[in-house]
Amino acid sequence: MSVLSWAFTVAWFTLWMLMLYLTNEMKLKFTDAAAIVNVFAGVSAIGHLGMQFLVDAFIGHFWMLCLSTLAFSFGFGFLAISASPILSGNGQKGLFYVALTVISVGIFGRSISLGVFTEDQLEDGRNKGNPAKLVSFVIGNVGNFVFLLLAAIAMPQISPWFVRFTIPSGCEVLAMLIFISGACSYKRVKPGGSPLTTVFRVFMASASKMSCAYSNNSSQLYEKAECDQDIKPHTSSLRYLDRAAMILQTESLEQQRKNRWKLCRVTEVEQTKSVIRTVPLFATSLISGIVFSLGNTFFLEQANHMDSKFGSWNLPLPLLLLFSEAARLGSRELCVMAAKRHAIDFPESPKQTKTPYGIPVSIILSIFCCSIAAHVESRRLKVVSTQGLLHETVPMSVFWLLPQYILLGSITGIYENSFALYLEETVPEELSQYMVLLNVGVCGVGIMSNIALVSLVGSVSGGKWFQDTINKSRVDNYYWVITVFCMFNLLLYFIVTYRYTVCNKKDGATQENDRRIIASV
């Protein structure tokens, strides 16, 4: 499995520099190039949820890894052909877009299955205490770190872009052959169905009973008394979903139980309610997605027009990504440590009242990140103006961008980890992964929203803020606009969490006074 991770690292660094290919080689306006990158990143994020459903319900992780590796191999192969001298014009552009579409399948397939499949192998009873497996795991992690450094340093040194795109394709083919060679020894967990089906069933059952009058008598709601699963108490919120558990008087209970799409347990209804209650918090992910979209678009374009020398050495731009990734991993560890300390200090704290404190921290850091980026860009543009360097590299060190990249990595790590921990505490365990992926999808929508925001701001500014190149534009003003949006996002977070806390308190009071009579089977 390590070879798949190593190949993914090479692909990751190659895709991170896609903005430079579009502006330097295809000669696109930097806003058009950013739009293409944002659509690609957004689609790659949105597809996670649907792919997770396919993996759980039909495919399984082994075959998903095979599919994702094939997608990477063909996708980068198409990308290499589109960048080669043999193609030009519409054929080149068409194949380029096809390549990105195929690669996006590889991204969300690999992201979903690689970690889970690796854990399955480590937890396999045949491998417990096996020194060879442990050594292989350690070598895999060390090798991944080495590949990070090699990819960051070596990839930018390769001049022809079609060669840069060919290397990830070759790595994926090699990784596929090595991965398949051990297929007989892998532990494979068969797809057991998706827990998301429960949510669909509740919506379908409640919709089928829309014409039925709702009764406040909770004794008319169905629950399976001898079920091995935890039984969740009935709550008063989102009452329209309670119809899914209503026992109709026109049919016998035995007949209704046979159709699971028309009668659900109260516990299943309450699980669906817990999912819906967290959805408003996802609104904060839209603006966070806009901030995330800057790292491999506008920030990278700034770096491309700045002095990257460190002494006599030309600093490879992907090293900025390494600093950002290090900040992301470090901030995630801090979040985990803070969560453990909170659990020790406040063991009696009920899960329903916990709020994701890491999210407002990440939003505050977003405000700092965008404001710092605005100040740095203002300084850079001042150098451009005073020295007349509209078409030249600006004699200003790329290290000026380091704070905003480190902040961006910290924001990503804190936000992702805080949201994941929060969802683990507030939604059923089997659905928490889907909610995490739903949040990733909403972030993807936010990333693509950057396109609309750039278009809107460009129209309002009369085209002065966004011109052909970043040296002629006023991206610093755009960063200030995003800073204001982040401030609004912080206010939105407090409104949503306050509303969520109030609703939970009402549900808690209702549970004490609204005891149902369980319909025994």
Curated annotation (Swiss-Prot):
GO CC aspect terms: membrane
The protein's location, in the record's own words, is:
Membrane
Keyword match Phosphoprotein: no
- Molecular function per GO: transmembrane transporter activity
The record's account of tissue expression is: Expressed in roots.
Q: Which domain of life is it from?
A: Eukaryota
| TM ranges | 3-23, 35-55, 62-82, 96-116, 134-154, 165-185, 279-299, 310-327, 356-376, 394-414, 440-460, 478-498
How this chain sits in the membrane, per its record, is: Multi-pass membrane protein
Q: Which InterPro entries match?
A: MFS_trans_sf, POT_fam
Q: Does the keyword tRNA-binding apply?
A: no
Which Pfam family, any one of them, does this sequence belong to? PTR2
The protein's UniProt keywords, in alphabetical order, are: Membrane, Transmembrane, Transmembrane helix, Transport
Homology family: Belongs to the major facilitator superfamily. Proton-dependent oligopeptide transporter (POT/PTR) (TC 2.A.17) family.
**Designated name of the protein:** Protein NRT1/ PTR FAMILY 5.5
Its ancestry begins with: Eukaryota, Viridiplantae, Streptophyta, Embryophyta, Tracheophyta
